[in-house]
Swiss-Prot record:
One of the primary rRNA binding proteins. Required for association of the 30S and 50S subunits to form the 70S ribosome, for tRNA binding and peptide bond formation. It has been suggested to have peptidyltransferase activity; this is somewhat controversial. Makes several contacts with the 16S rRNA in the 70S ribosome. GO terms for molecular function: rRNA binding; structural constituent of ribosome; transferase activity. It comes from the Bacteria. Residues 221-275 are annotated as: Disordered. Gene3D superfamilies: 2.30.30.30, Nucleic acid-binding proteins, Ribosomal protein L2, domain 3. This is Large ribosomal subunit protein uL2. It comes from Desulfosudis oleivorans (strain DSM 6200 / JCM 39069 / Hxd3). InterPro entries: NA-bd_OB-fold, Rib_uL2_dom2, Ribosomal_uL2, Ribosomal_uL2_bac/org-type, Ribosomal_uL2_C, Ribosomal_uL2_CS, Ribosomal_uL2_dom3, Ribosomal_uL2_RNA-bd_dom. One of its GO terms (biological process) is cytoplasmic translation. Pfam families: Ribosomal_L2, Ribosomal_L2_C. PANTHER family: LARGE RIBOSOMAL SUBUNIT PROTEIN UL2M, RIBOSOMAL PROTEIN L2.
Amino acid sequence: MGIRKVKPTSPGRRFQEYSTFEEITADRPSEKGLIEPLRKTGGRNVNGRITCRHRGGGHKRHYRVIDFKRNKDDIPAKVAAIEYDPNRSARIALLFYADGEKRYILAPVNLKVGDTVMSGQASEIKPGNAMPLASIPLGTEVHNIELRLGKGGQIVRSAGGYAKVMAKEARYVLLRLPSSEMRKVLATCKATIGRVGNVEHDDVSIGKAGRNRWLGKRPRVRGVAMNPVDHPMGGGEGKSSGGRHPCSPWGQQSKGVRTRNNKRTDQFIVKRRSK
């Protein structure tokens, strides 16, 4: 993948950059049976109340059904296409299994059309193959990692992401996550070999506010620019500092204070993420 800069024919175009999409082999979804309608919520719940701010609008999309479980063991599959997915930063690969089934998976780096991938304990150590963490050698880069056996990959799924297998101890495997957190995961949980493709995704310059609106992202207003009724840091005469430590609209501190509440899984975190 490369990044293409555009000519500055207008102020809005001056800083825009785009992916060259050179790895994409299909200009539309190849398999109609693996796409579903996707209804927009605008960040609202069933009661119409905003539960996720800064969402709304954006281009209409179809959802691509991705196989995060990789539970079709010991059956080889051929990569038929590498496709664009508007719902995620990574590219997706269309697999044709030997028994006729078709599935989408996240496309790792260096996976090409015509390659063969497989999942299962006896799979080869190469990009795109999925297997239990217990079968993966130390130092290997992995992605799409399960946290619960059979639930499907939940972490390390965005473009360019990878975790590294650091150690194995009894029933657990120690992983270093992209955040630098060191975490123990059950050795029977599956992971996929390699790092997620589209590595240069973070280097693309959006260039203008309107392009974020195309992606369904609404403006993010600073708390100090609001009125006191809207935010704890709002109000004041002229330009103010907010008068307190940075926080959310509900008063939860947002810088330098630990706000993690899930004590149940603290036992699996060997070293917290570094900022």
